[in-house]
């Protein structure tokens, strides 16, 4: 049994290793040279994970949940006369639309059903029709359902039409290989508590240096000013403008070391992929059907359709919690689903124990 009181089968926060937890038992000063040097190391390691063309990119760390970092990008990168095209097929794409509207940014939406990927033909049509669009954003892994969106195609279109490209890779970065230089991504956003397997407390933005320099003075918020945050970290050896989550940063640094020890992003992807395939195979044997078509399914989290009208998710949830597992309810409106994640410190034995527990906790048919 895992040392945790529960194994979190969620898309983040997730189950972390004992060693990641242990580094949070100590206290650190935000002004300490050793701490700030470590912050710089974290920033450099993130760029190295993101691309081989490291000199073109830089990292900004931002306090708060991943959503704070997304809003920092939306509010800092798009100028007053800019216009944003949002590709959405889930809650997190919709949240970006909400942000843009709250910040009085002109926004155009390309929306597909939650179980269907971004419609590339529609995106191109919108780019052809609306010459005022300056920026385009897509969510890579939409954890509303677990679907993977075609960021390669979206980014190609963005560059074909001369747009600044933003990718919300919150639940994919560190777990799925991405080279932001190859894809010509200008701003990629993720969080400490996802595939790198840290804990919640900050997000990060890996940015094209040339595009980031254009953001000076554009921010619509003091605390979420992406350029000012970067400039302070760059000029003052890793210093944050405001109090940083020191324990979380140390845990994240440890998580980065453990990602490297595992064999890097490809090795972690292989583990997640194997977990997800095993999970789906076993769940199908019990009569559960995945919502998303296999060719669009991510290795991060899987949505399962309720097997029958009388199925009680809460009953299954409570039963699994009794066995030491926590899963997620569904998040879409048109189909009754629940979700099971397989990222974090989760392995084949854990998946086998989970499905055995599900078999005990629910009767289908």
Swiss-Prot record:
Main enzyme class = transferase
Q: Which is one Pfam family of this protein?
A: Aminotran_5
**What reaction is this protein's catalytic activity?**
(2-aminoethyl)phosphonate + pyruvate = phosphonoacetaldehyde + L-alanine
Q: What EC number(s) does its UniProt record assign?
A: 2.6.1.37
* Residues bearing PTM N6-(pyridoxal phosphate)lysine: 194
| Swiss-Prot/TrEMBL cofactor(s) | pyridoxal 5'-phosphate
Keywords, A to Z, come to: Aminotransferase, Pyridoxal phosphate, Pyruvate, Transferase
Q: Which Gene3D superfamilies does the entry mention?
A: Aspartate Aminotransferase, domain 1, Type I PLP-dependent aspartate aminotransferase-like (Major domain)
InterPro entries attached here? Aminotrans_V_dom (IPR000192), NH2EtPonate_pyrv_transaminase (IPR012703), PyrdxlP-dep_Trfase (IPR015424), PyrdxlP-dep_Trfase_major (IPR015421), PyrdxlP-dep_Trfase_small (IPR015422), SP_NH2Trfase/AEP_transaminase (IPR024169)
Homology family:
Belongs to the class-V pyridoxal-phosphate-dependent aminotransferase family. PhnW subfamily.
What PANTHER family does its record include?
2-AMINOETHYLPHOSPHONATE--PYRUVATE TRANSAMINASE (PTHR42778:SF1)
According to its UniProt entry, what is the function of this protein?
Involved in phosphonate degradation.
HAMAP family noted in UniProt: PhnW_aminotrans_5
Question: What is the designated name of this protein?
Answer: 2-aminoethylphosphonate--pyruvate transaminase
Organism field: Bacillus mycoides (strain KBAB4)
